[in-house]
Amino acid sequence: MASLIYRQLLTNSYTVELSDEIQEIGSTKTQDVTVNPGPFAQTNYAPVNWGPGETNDSTTVEPVLDGPYQPTTFNPPVSYWMLLAPTNAGVVVEGTNNTNRWLATILIEPNVQQVERTYTLFGQQVQVTVSNNSQTKWKFVDLSKQTQDGNYSQHGSLLSTPKLYGVMKHGGKIYTYNGETPNATTDYYSTTNFDTVNMTAYCDFYIIPLAQEAKCTKYINNGLPPIQNTRNIVPVSIVSRNIVYTRAQPNQDIVVSKTSLWKEMQYNRDIVIRFKFANSIIKSGGLGYKWSEVSFKPANYQYTYTRDGEEVTAHTTCSVNGINNFNYNGGSLPTDFVISKYEVIKENSFVYIDYWDDSQAFRNMVNVRSLAADLNSVMCTGGDYSFALPLGHYPVMTGGAVSLHSAGVTLSTQFTDFVSLNSLRFRFRLSVEEPPFSILRTRVSGLYGLPAARPNNSQEYYEIAGRFSLISLVPSNDDYQTPIINSVTVRQDLERQLGELRDEFNNLSQQIAMSQLIDLALLPLDMFSMFSGIKSTIDAAKSMATNVMKRFKKSSLANSVSTLTDSLSDAASSISRNASVRSVSSTASAWTEVSNITSDINVTTSSISTQTSTISRRLRLKEMATQTDGMNFDDISAAVLKTKIDKSTQLNTNTLPEIVTEASEKFIPNRAYRVIKDDEVLEASTDGKYFAYKVETFEEIPFDVQKFADLVTDSPVISAIIDFKTLKNLNDNYGISRQQALNLLRSDPRVLREFINQDNPIIRNRIESLIMQCRL
């Protein structure tokens, strides 16, 4: 039978070389996450950013934490936070525009009763009444006046454990922090000529750009990173910030060495990376309340931008690795909301962005050394996605955020629709950010990460500015170009190829002749005969079979076999421990997984439907293990697969393993299985439908789920190629003998061929419907 190919793949797919395993582990990483919501389900993350520090050769990348600097008087740049780190009580900072705003901040130690103290503010002795009732936290207080001879008033106190304070000039205002750590927030004072306000810092301080305000707030609330609190960190003068040094231009080509035929060129480029995520949201069959998958997909994006007066055309491909698989199950009823799998990227994930532009740097990117890059970080936030239910309020997946931080660069190759491009792959590590994501109107809430439902949040693209530098060996004659070959890391976008191949496979279903299909389904297809139609040589067929086996090892069918083997082992050990007791939980459960529910005889109709559906999903494996003379669904699916492989014009060695594995999982999703006991037939399908009837008259009788579970264990399981409704329709319209009925019930291929050769419309329609279910 044609289903021999699946049994061979299951048998042989576990022999894999160690080098292949290592390569696969390095290229693919998926993590299943089980979430148990509770008061301690989520925790905050430490505000530590272990980075390389400032890189002075970039015109676009600036450090997150610049400093520390020594106490001084200067005019801070606009839109930059001064993060002040005092060590003792007293005046921390003061600033004025010399017209209508004099603002100073003082620090008061813990546990200070109301007392009058003298402070020197703007060169004058001032008496101020202060207090701090906190036993552990230090208190920052703003002192402000609007005229030179006016009196100071106190504003915006901040109770702080880390003993850090922030001041910034921005948008006609002076911003500070108030409240109590770890929940301090920003506040502001309006002022004129804000850009001319000079600041005098009486303690060490850092400078943080406004774009990194979230980091500044984390430092205020939680303290500086541990590396900043060591004796190796020495404050320097603020004038060091103004040291003039030579920076590379946005576009720079430098000849490193040159011979008659070859030369080494160093390319320095400022780049703007724009990218977006793509996703796939797949709805399951049924009543419309269930989704099978919400996943990330590779996304291509082409754009133009201006670099040093030159318009640059760029192309990016964004992909993700280290996916976390979540799921939500609202219940077992057909109208309960279910998401079988939705993907989330978190701190254990990586984002890869392959970048190419039309500059000279990418013309000869084959032999490359000294590759380096530095990029800014970017925040990616999730939007709202509504799951449209037929009735009731829509569940909405909302929120979620991650920030991307540069973690390295390698060479790669992008495969677009028209051309292959040697490019750079920028790797980004992730950290989770606020807000968390949730699914409204469900129990899912307060989870961190970026889900795949709407990762772009209505934005056309995300943008990162940065710079890269590399040295490339190129021909001395600039008119020559080295050919494009696979670089260090090859990124082949199989999604596009597989999408086109799936469409071709689905269209080929209409070109299959049923009589030939039945003959092909009866042939013992092995791996060589299955794949030999693609390549003529034996070695090529062997290589393809090996690749298919490697991929097939990870299929859901192979995983089901592994699970079943464990169940049978448990059942065997249970029986050996107590041979005198025949337990449904130790025998039938290995095939049916209904050990806990078959004991209740008074079950409802919906409960029986659930049980029979659960049993039917496992009967494919039982049928494989106890092969009969009848034809089964896998014979038909394998024959259809063989026919389509022979007819396909787009199949290759890269896509074949994916297609064969998908076919084993997705061909003929709606299957029915039957067991025969004397003159009774019990039949159940994977969609929960069940029938019990007599062979002689096709008269329906009550369905006994306990009897069905027992027969499944002890009797052969038969694929209902011609299901009960088709049989009853055939008998009512044409009339069939008892022997013909038994042969059709046993899925006898000879009888099937006879009906097809007689052009029986009922049988032909049934076989055609099975062929049309062979879709990817």
Curated annotation (Swiss-Prot):
Region Hydrophobic, residue ranges: 389-409
Pfam families, per database record: Rota_VP4_MID, VP4_haemagglut, VP4_helical
Annotated motif KID motif, positions: 644-646
rRNA-binding recorded as keyword: no
GO cellular component: host cell endoplasmic reticulum-Golgi intermediate compartment; host cell plasma membrane; host cell rough endoplasmic reticulum; host cytoskeleton; membrane; viral outer capsid
Disulfide bonds: 203-216, 318-380
GO biological process: permeabilization of host organelle membrane involved in viral entry into host cell; virion attachment to host cell
Annotated site, Binding to sialic acid, chain positions: 101, 190
Family to which the UniProt record says this protein belongs: Belongs to the rotavirus VP4 family.
Region (Spike head): 65-224
Extra facts: In group A rotaviruses, VP4 defines the P serotype.
Biological source species: Rotavirus A (strain RVA/Cow/France/RF/1975/G6P6[1])
Name the UniProt record assigns to this protein: Outer capsid protein VP4
Motif (YGL motif): 448-450
